[in-house]
Amino acid sequence: MQRVITYIDGFNLYFGMKAQYNNKYLWLDVEALSNSLLIPGQSLVATKYFTSMVTNQPDKEKRQRTYLDALKSSTGCLFYYGRYQSNIINCRGCGSNWPSPKEKMTDVNIATQMLMDAFTDKFDVAILISGDTDLIPPIEA
């Protein structure tokens, strides 16, 4: 039986699904999704979910917390967290400045975890769910 670990870029998956399907799949059970990708002879040994917690936006924070709490209580997903870094955006037209949060560490966390799991022989097959091309190099490694 082949051991499978699924690595999920939560931020990328969320915005990709939202862009493609609007709100239809925002409550996606990522462990069920992972199981649906298996072929005969494979067994899911872990689903690893990578994200950063939203800050300074109470409505978004609450929605994210609610979703992650639901996943934690109904699945065996393992969670890994990055962070948000606030960059200042300047409007050249009007001179106004405003904060623009940027997710950090998710790609690094996924790549690190994937390589550590490969090195310690935790899986035979790794499935990466992301649309981020930054993750191509660790996959090719």
Predicted regions and their residues:
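Domain-level signal for Mg2+-assisted phosphodiester chemistry and nucleotide/NA-binding surfaces
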Residues: M1-P99
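Nuclease catalytic cores that cleave nucleic-acid phosphodiester bonds
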Residues: L78-A141
